[in-house]
Amino acid sequence: EVPESALYGVQTLRGIENFRISKFHLNEYPLFIQALAITKMGAVVANRKLDLLTEEQADAILKACKEVLEGKHHEQFPVDMIQGGAGTTTNMNVNEVIANRALELMGHRRGEYQYCSPNDHVNRSQSTNDAYPTAIHIGLYYTHLKLVKHFGELIASFR
């Protein structure tokens, strides 16, 4: 049973139970969580422009994603980093957290997925094979920017 305090849902809980492989969990990788939120935000904007989401759904999902970007709710990502497949458990964990937070922002209860579904709304027009590698690329880009900055500082210190 999903804990009452959890923003994640039953798919995440099943993933936790099925994949106890390493001691490394998604919540230990904030940059990857943020990159996944950015990926979801991009899909929401595109889906709203195509009228595949209502304005209310899109606004709530975007607000939930922004909260994740600000570092909120990171404890809600307990899945193991090593999983079977291509990261489906990670993708569903993110979808469920964003959907349930969006539901709260819309004035609904967690799990009332007829209003905002992890699959049908947050993950619309995506698959794990889209979202996961896109987030990896986004995370690498931001890591690259930090590395370039630090190399610049190192070079300056030698002058």
Predicted regions and their residues:
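Conserved, well-structured ligand/cofactor-binding cores
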Residues: 1-159
